[in-house]
């Protein structure tokens, strides 16, 4: 149910990557919410954004963002947190009452950094709203980073916003973040370097290839396995000063947790798979998206023109498979 990470490159670019793993046909699209945009929460609260932002979202009883970045370089991705998130059931006086899915609008539309978000958090109250399209109140938490590379988890307890620093910069799903950090202790032996030979009863035991240092790295698609795998790979992926290669490396990291159709089949739903991958450059305020069934990357940069429009802009990019043919006999 989604993997997110944040990485800072050698040339001081901050990138947030995420997979959107789900079993409902989202048909997600890149979109822009401009500065000073008037909006109405499903709780009845009305507001006006202070900052413009771009992201990827879907029309689900109103447009819902799954991720995005604002003009100050604050970025976010939405992820499930079943069994741990708890929302309010009624409105709270003297608070901004919004739904669990509208956290993206608050964070991107009203905050300039994680520190700013922390200062505003006490003014927010999250009210549970049932979504008919998916048949539940989605239990959510959020991976949030700012232009400095600082990352946090945003979750909810009885509707109150809970912010936890996340220096490893990886977020998946349940259990809670403390559990995931503790679980990493089981994998401190995993290394990108080859294991050394060992002498056993006078016999030299050689490692099985250069990859032997990674033996024991989890390979499944549970949230616990994805967390460990992403934490290891993010920490060790080779970096250089090539901005385009940094972008490709971020997508390669996402490929390591990408779920093809047919690999995860819930009893009560269709195939659960990675519907799209997104890499967000917080430094340049650019959104890169790659959809399932396409090998193309579509890019959307947050420009002054988009920020200053009156209404939302939703893009519907075509999805293509591009193959470069080296001869004509194909």
Stretch-by-stretch model annotation:
Residues 1-15, 129-131, 137-138, 147-149, ...:
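C-terminus-biased signal that marks the final domain/tail of proteins
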Residues 118-154:
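Aromatic- and glycine-enriched pocket-lining scaffold segments that form the walls
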């Amino acid at each position: 149910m989604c993997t997110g990470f944040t990485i800072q490159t050698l040339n001081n670019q901050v990138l947030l990557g995420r997979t959107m793993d789900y079993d409902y046909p989202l048909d997600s699209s890149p979109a822009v919410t401009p500065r000073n945009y008037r909006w109405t929460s499903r709780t009845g609260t009305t507001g006006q954004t202070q900052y413009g932002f771009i992201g990827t979202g879907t029309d689900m009883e109103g447009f819902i963002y799954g991720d995005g970045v604002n003009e100050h370089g604050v970025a976010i991705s939405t992820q499930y947190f079943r069994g741990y998130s708890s929302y309010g059931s009624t409105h709270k006086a003297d608070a901004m009452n919004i739904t669990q899915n509208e956290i993206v609008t608050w964070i991107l539309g009203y905050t300039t950094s994680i520190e700013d978000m922390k200062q505003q958090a006490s003014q927010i109250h999250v009210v549970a709203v049932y979504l008919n399209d998916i048949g539940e109140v989605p239990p959510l938490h959020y991976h949030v980073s700012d232009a400095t590379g600082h990352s946090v988890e945003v979750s909810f307890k009885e509707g109150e916003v809970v912010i936890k620093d996340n220096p490893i910069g990886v977020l998946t799903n349940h259990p809670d973040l403390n559990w995931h950090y503790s679980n990493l202790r089981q994998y401190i032996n995993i290394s990108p370097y080859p294991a050394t030979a060992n002498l056993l009863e006078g016999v030299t035991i050689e490692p099985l290839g250069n990859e032997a240092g990674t033996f024991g790295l989890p390979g499944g698609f549970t949230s616990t396995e994805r967390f460990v795998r992403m934490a290891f790979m993010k920490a060790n992926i080779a970096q250089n000063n090539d901005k385009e290669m940094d972008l490709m490396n971020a997508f390669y990291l996402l490929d390591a947790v990408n779920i093809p159709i047919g690999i995860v089949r819930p009893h009560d739903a269709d195939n659960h798979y990675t519907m799209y991958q997104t890499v967000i450059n917080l430094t340049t305020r650019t959104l890169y998206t790659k959809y399932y069934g396409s090998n193309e990357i579509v890019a959307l940069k947050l420009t002054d023109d988009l920020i200053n429009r009156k209404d939302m802009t939703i893009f519907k990019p075509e999805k293509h498979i591009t193959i470069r043919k080296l001869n004509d006999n194909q």
